[in-house]
Amino acid sequence: DKKYDTPIFKEVNPNFISRFTKRLINNPTKRLLVGITGESASGKSTICQEIKKTIEHLNMPISVLSTDNYFNDISELIKKYGCFDTLRDNGYDIDAPESFQLQLLRSDLLTLASGKNIMAPRYIPNGTGVSVPRALDVNSQKIIVVEGIATMYEEVRDVFDVKVYIETENDIRKERFLKRAVTERNQNEENAIKQWE
């Protein structure tokens, strides 16, 4: 696409498009699950939204789900330590597999793949660590795009038909990460820099 300085996809297997199209056309009940992952602030959500716009422009039904909503509720831990930054400084790794509700994520993905809708949790990324159970209504559409670090964890990665890894230059990621940490996640810049490093 001309509006991007660098290509979105470095390489696409030539047989992929053919297999992808045949799978959707030949099996009307089949759901296609696409997992998009990459390091923090690599552009997973942005790419996901671009895919959604493109698919909707083609008048095809699509659902989008973020694995960030499957973070464990850590509100009590944050209260205990006073704030998220102190909790992290004491060894809590928000990107570790144990920080996610992976069994629930797997179950929800399999339910979507079977053609049934789900009520997904909603994690509130404002520094409180609150996760609200069954808060988001997600429809099982023909194409289901799931983005987030957790998509490629061992517990769930086999559920996806297509897996995409987003690779972004480190300086771009750092700038995005710091901006998001301060403006969206209620962190101060000093602690956000510490978390990045």
Label the model's feature ranges:
Residues 1-35, 40:
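Extreme N-terminal, non-catalytic leader segments
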Residues 50:
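Active-site signature of alpha/beta-hydrolase-fold catalytic machinery across serine-
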Residues 63-66, 70-125:
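Conserved nucleotide-sensing/catalytic segment adjacent to the nucleotide-binding pocket
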Residues 47:
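Hydrophobic positions on the alpha1 helix immediately C-terminal to the Walker A/P-loop
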Residues 1, 153, 183-197:
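Small-molecule kinase domains that catalyze NTP-dependent phosphoryl transfer to phosphate-bearing small molecules
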Residues 131-183:
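ATP-dependent NMP and nucleoside kinases share a basic, alpha-helical "lid"
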Residues 53-63:
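Post-Walker A helix-loop "phosphate-sensing" segment adjacent to the P-loop in P-loop NTPases
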Residues 44:
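Conserved lysine of the Walker
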